[in-house]
Amino acid sequence: MRQYLDLLAHVLENGIDREDRTGTGTRGVFGYQMRFDLSDGFPVLTTKKLHLRSIIYELLWFLKGDTNIRYLQENGVTIWDEWADENGDLGPVYGAQWRSWPAPDGRHIDQIANLLNGLRENPYSRRHIVTAWNPAEIDGMALPPCHCLFQFHVAEGRLSCQLYQRSADIFLGVPFNIASYALLTMMIAQVTGLKPGDFVHTLGDAHLYKNHFDQAREQLTRTPKPLPTMWINPEVDDLFAFGYEDFRLEGYVADPTIRAPIAV
């Protein structure tokens, strides 16, 4: 994906060096946008291989409203281990906000169910928004949401999604986020009778950690390959009924993984 390599190059060449919460140090820019036409193929990196299993199971975990890593660990996914407490809990992170946002009157709001209803009943609304940024519960979260708000848009029978990501770990996090929200868009398009449109990824603080510079430069020496396609089981018409076996990435050819340390 040339869009992603352009982002890497832009930050390396034009970013500003700053200290950060983790003490690692970053180079970054504030404000950057990428657009992916989902009819061109599934936007997963081909210049390094990604662990698609982790991406799919994490998305299913979000949609379940789960905030304990037990489900992830049972399915071989360890990407949240560093932030969980001794019981595997993360506090009211993404899944809780998506599926059970606490209202002042004691109700809990299922933002995903509301989104689906809105897309079916009033597709041209400008209110198809889900947010994970709940100021009242930030302090109880193991990690405040990085990808914090997304909006859907319907035009000419195509469903597009724009994600706002306040904090974007370009080397490790952003490739996962692109694939995850592209897949979510395709899933929601299927269950609402629409075709996938664009995924627009808007980044706030887009940064490379200093201990990822060499890995980013190595990736920039690689040439992108044709995008694969994502097969989604056409029999599934309920967003909450999808399982891991309902997805298959076809034609995925990628360069080897480039390992990099995670900043906690």
Curated annotation (Swiss-Prot):
Transcription as UniProt keyword: no
Residue positions of the active site: C146
Annotated protein name in UniProt: Thymidylate synthase
Species classification: Bacteria, Pseudomonadati, Pseudomonadota, Alphaproteobacteria, Hyphomicrobiales
Complex formation: Homodimer.
Organism (species): Chelativorans sp. (strain BNC1)
Keyword set, alphabetical order: Cytoplasm, Methyltransferase, Nucleotide biosynthesis, Transferase
PANTHER family: THYMIDYLATE SYNTHASE, THYMIDYLATE SYNTHASE 1
Entries under Pfam families matching the protein: Thymidylat_synt
